[in-house]
């Protein structure tokens, strides 16, 4: 059983016809699986801005080149995960792919990295969402922690109750988000063509640090959070209507194009228009205010951004309990993680995620900027392991055009592996060490639980076999 086979729908015991009825179209699938990926511009743009603004106009002039390099990485990942969609019709998450092709320990490392990723996605998304709305209503800034915890409590309760008709619930905010940002970007391009670019030298603050290679690497590493969430569709291939692999693959490409457009568009306009954020404002808020003014449209954009980031956080409440249940089925976690409550959800996993995310929000004072260094480490470790597993898969299966497919995943694995090293090095002191320490500790925990459960099985078998 894979990460996506269990828990795709509210209750795994529902009849086959019900499963078929709940399969999603490409438009529904885009809404269901893309929120955290599309909403990642909320924190990726901000981290690139914060990383470069300390070097003044010279630093900010590198925003678009850095975003372009990250978009190239996004393209490699999109093509790689497109292949995973085609090769694993039952769902191909990092844990599944790595364990099946690289072995148990690499699979557990991927699982540990995913757990860290899911946890940080909740904390970062909710705190970034609060930043978005506080940019519109500055009086809310002192209440970042409280508001983040309030949002966390809300989505926890909704998930414990079981959100059965998630398609429509997800689709409305996702498409509102696209309807808010894509026209705004289009208007920005038109305005740029009429008024021309604005020199950053006239708007950027004075540099307080020199522009160094280390600063650029550090900014690149935090900006790479823009590619988080791209794996979600490969996890959910069975949820798509037949032909599921084709529909999932096409949805992956559409999502990646939207991610690239939003990311490059917002970063590009910010740089070319010379947009600079105030001390209590996100860079996306500053861009929206610059383009549409401080009126109803601006406030609507900020509200939609908050909602989108909250839904992005909710994807972890679907993915992590499912992953924990699969690992418990594989005997690497306690059996209670497989239990569904009366509403057909993995309540133990949901509660565990909510508690851990709450601790992080409180421990880091509701600061998404402080949480980001922990985030990217697990993401790129999981990406590297899954793509390395795909190279092994194609080398073993040797199907049609297997050499080209293996080469693509190899290039992707090398790219994400290098990015993992850059993130670990440049953000180690900033908090990446916590994730780098937590991942092996989780692997040791999984192995310990597996050993204990095997011992218990042996003891139970011996007691039942004795006369």
List each language-model region with its residue ranges.
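Membrane-interface loop-to-helix entry segments
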Residues: 155, 160-190, 252-255, 372-385, ...
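Helix-loop-helix junctions that connect adjacent transmembrane segments
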Residues: 175, 180-228, 426, 430
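TM-loop-TM module centered on a large, flexible mid-protein loop between adjacent transmembrane helices
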Residues: 103, 254-312, 337-365
């Amino acid at each position: 059983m894979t990460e996506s086979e269990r828990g795709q729908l509210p209750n795994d015991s529902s009849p086959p016809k019900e499963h078929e009825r709940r399969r999603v179209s490409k438009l529904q699938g885009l809404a269901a699986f893309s929120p955290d990926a599309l909403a990642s511009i909320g924190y990726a743009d901000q981290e690139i801005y914060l990383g470069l603004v300390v070097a003044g106009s010279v630093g900010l002039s590198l925003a678009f080149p850095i975003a372009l390099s990250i978009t190239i990485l996004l393209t490699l990942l999109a093509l790689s995960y497109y292949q995973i969609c085609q090769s694993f019709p039952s769902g191909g998450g990092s844990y599944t792919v790595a364990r099946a092709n690289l072995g148990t320990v690499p699979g557990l490392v991927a699982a540990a990295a995913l757990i860290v990723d899911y946890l940080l996605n909740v904390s970062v998304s909710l705190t970034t969402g609060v930043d978005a709305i506080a940019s519109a209503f500055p009086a809310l800034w002192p209440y970042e922690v409280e508001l983040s915890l309030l949002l966390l409590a809300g989505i926890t309760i909704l998930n414990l109750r079981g959100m059965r008709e998630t398609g429509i619930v997800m689709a409305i905010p996702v498409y509102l988000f696209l309807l808010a940002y894509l026209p705004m970007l289009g208007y920005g391009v038109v305005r740029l063509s009429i008024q021309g670019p604005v020199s950053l030298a006239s708007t950027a603050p004075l540099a307080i640090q020199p522009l160094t290679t280390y600063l650029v690497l550090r900014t690149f590493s935090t900006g790479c959070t823009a590619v988080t969430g791209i794996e979600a569709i490969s996890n959910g291939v069975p949820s798509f209507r037949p032909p599921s692999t084709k529909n999932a693959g096409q949805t992956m490409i559409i999502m990646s194009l939207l991610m690239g457009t939003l990311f490059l568009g917002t970063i590009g306009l910010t740089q070319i228009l010379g947009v600079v954020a105030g001390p209590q404002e996100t860079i996306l808020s500053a861009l929206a205010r610059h383009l549409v003014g401080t009126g109803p449209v601006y406030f609507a954009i900020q509200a939609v951004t908050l909602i989108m980031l909250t839904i992005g956080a909710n994807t972890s409440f679907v993915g992590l309990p499912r992953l924990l249940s699969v690992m418990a089925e594989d005997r690497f976690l306690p059996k209670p993680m497989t239990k569904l409550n009366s509403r057909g959800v993995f309540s133990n996993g949901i509660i565990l995620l909510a508690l851990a995310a709450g601790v992080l929000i409180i421990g880091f004072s509701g600061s998404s900027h402080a949480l980001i260094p922990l985030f990217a480490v697990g993401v790129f470790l999981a990406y590297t392991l899954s793509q390395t597993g795909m190279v092994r898969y194609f080398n073993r299966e040797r199907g049609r055009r297997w050499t080209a497919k293996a080469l693509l995943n190899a290039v992707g694995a090398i790219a994400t592996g290098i990015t993992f090293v850059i993130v670990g090095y440049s953000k180690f002191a900033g908090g990446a060490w916590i994730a780098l320490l937590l991942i092996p500790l989780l692997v040791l925990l999984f192995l310990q639980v597996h050993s204990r459960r095997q011992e218990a099985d042996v003891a139970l078998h011996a007691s039942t076999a004795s006369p």
